Amino acid sequence: MLAAFQQQQTRKFSPITNTSASCLNIQPNPPKISIAPSVISVIGVHMEKNKLKVRTGQSTELSASVLPMQATNKELIWTNMNADVITLYPKGDTVTITGKSAGRAVVIVTTAEGKFRDLCIIHVQPYMTNPK
């Protein structure tokens, strides 16, 4: 940009009456200045819970936060490590977890760049009805 300012075109003209100017500085296209936004890198991801209980047939939500809060790319990837036990329904920084069958599963959240991850262990308990 500085070079564009230094290379301004100067042209010599005949003197203009009633003035003492003999040079005019003409800029047919003024330089365009743009400021690119800075990229704020991700330094981590944190899930709100590291253990969670849910009953079969019931749902609960789990959320995660990208650190710092001002990070440029806050995209998260949710992974279910045991699809027989739970089902995931991700939506941005939140995932809905539905218990399918009794057992344990692990939910992993990973930043879009893949550098940071966190996990939560899900315990699915059988749905119990009131005994007679």
From Swiss-Prot:
Organism: Bacillus anthracis
Listed SUPFAM superfamilies: Invasin/intimin cell-adhesion fragments (SSF49373)
Origin superkingdom: Bacteria
Upper classification of the organism: Bacteria, Bacillati, Bacillota, Bacilli, Bacillales
Name of this protein: Uncharacterized protein BA_1245/GBAA_1245/BAS1153
Pfam families linked to this entry: Big_2 (PF02368)
The family this protein is said to belong to: To B.cereus BC1230.
Domain called BIG2: residue spans: 44-115
Residues of the signal peptide: none
SMART domains per record: BID_2
